[in-house]
Amino acid sequence: MARYIGPKHKLCRRVGRPLCGSAKCPALKRPYRPGQHGPGRPQKLSEYGAQLLEKQKLRFIYGVMERQFRRYFEQAQRSRGVTGEVLLQLLEQRLDTVVYRLGFARTMAAARQLVGHGHVTLNGRRVDIASCQVKPGDVVGLTQKARSLAVVRESLDLRRPVPPYLSLDETTMTSRLQRLPLREEIPVDVDESLVVELYAR
């Protein structure tokens, strides 16, 4: 599956906020577009510009390329429920996202790498596809080798709160997706209705 391999902090600065999960993200000090010599006078975005910005933010947060993102949107459109909320649920059901929410990795990119290197199991079977959809009732876990990895231990030591829709057994390092997340349980500062409006144009 294709992925963005360019400079991550450049994306953060493009949207004006840290999306990479790093505490040292340059966007915290310089929340303006890269290439500008200083913040300058803020420009008012057009309606299309605001919609595009929200879509790009969502794509960058989850590390999804445009073609795959559109597929998620089309799937959300076909599903019952509010399209924007269903879109977020589909993105939250990605295996790499679940691994990140469980605190097994510090960033979404690190979670994707953990999955890609075969350190994650789904219902007892090793899976190396980050975009694999986790369904309610599925059990996500770490391989025996992954449990002793320094990067995993360091991430778990941060003690990030686990969302209420996931149950984590710290003894076995496994988690069950109890249900689909509610909108207020998804910690993403994005107006998904603007994304829906963009694709409806």
Curated annotation (Swiss-Prot):
Q: Which domain of life is it from?
A: Bacteria
- Give yes or no: UniProt keyword Amino-acid biosynthesis: no
Cellular component GO terms, alphabetical:
small ribosomal subunit
Domain S4 RNA-binding, chain residue ranges per copy: 93-156
PROSITE patterns assigned: RIBOSOMAL_S4, S4
Provide a Gene Ontology MF annotation, just one. Answer: rRNA binding
Task: Note the subunit structure.
Answer: Part of the 30S ribosomal subunit. Contacts protein S5. The interaction surface between S4 and S5 is involved in control of translational fidelity.
Show the PANTHER family listed in the entry. Answer: 30S 40S RIBOSOMAL PROTEIN, SMALL RIBOSOMAL SUBUNIT PROTEIN US4M
The protein's matches in NCBIfam families, at most eight in alphabetical order, are given as:
PRK05327.1 (NF003717), rpsD_bact (TIGR01017)
The name this protein carries in UniProt is: Small ribosomal subunit protein uS4B
* Organism of this sequence: Symbiobacterium thermophilum (strain DSM 24528 / JCM 14929 / IAM 14863 / T)
